[in-house]
Amino acid sequence: MRFERCAIATTTATLASLALAAGASAHGTLNLYGKNAFANKTGTLTLTIPHGCGPDGLSTTKIVMQLSSAWQAAKPNAVAGWKSSVKRAANGQRTLTWLATGSGLPNAEVGDFPITVRWPKKAGTYNTPTAQYCGTQLMDWKDPFNAAADGDLPYPANYPVPRVRVHAAATRAPSAVTGSFPISICPLHGASGSTQ
């Protein structure tokens, strides 16, 4: 049973990795690099920008990400060639901004922008609307995910909003055992009193 659970978990993680790799070729993505997000814990969330803007492939010069008030803390990690800032509005929403200090991220290069965060207190799926600027051109990653195409939105979305799943906080076994102990009712083998 333990082996089956391990095999299922490994297969699921592998498929998720393949899905992320496929998505990274076209859209702004969020990566956790093998570490799940747990409610009310700290972790690292990485925004990946896989290309520039428009048919001319302009370099990315500015990135702006919005985090709702559910997020408890967020601080961009240092990225060479970029300066970052965080502004918190009165309603608790955070705006993370990265500005290129040079020519920006070329169209042919992939850029990672890691953020140290304290995950929201409640488990759930959280959107992180993100705007990618290439000079005056904008790629606005904020389209909602819908089950199928409808009159207002195509499927899949042209500019899907990056989002992350936050799991319920993991419970740990107590460090010291107290109280009553279970009694084994398994038959004993061998001589009387043996506990093989």
Where are these regions (language model features)?
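Bacterial N-terminal signal peptides that target proteins for export
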Residues: 1-11
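Bacterial N-terminal signal peptides
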Residues: 10-19
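Sec/Tat signal peptide C-region and signal peptidase I cleavage site
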Residues: 22-26
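Extracytoplasmic/periplasmic copper-protein system
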Residues: 27-33, 39, 135-196
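Low-complexity, serine/threonine/proline/glycine-rich extracellular segments that form mucin-like
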Residues: 39-76
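Short, solvent-exposed loop/turn segments enriched in Ser/Thr/Gly
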Residues: 40-46, 111-112, 125-128
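A surface/secretory-pathway sequence property marking extracellular, secreted
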Residues: 68-95, 162-168
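Low-complexity, intrinsically disordered segments enriched in Ser/Thr together with acidic residues
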Residues: 101-124
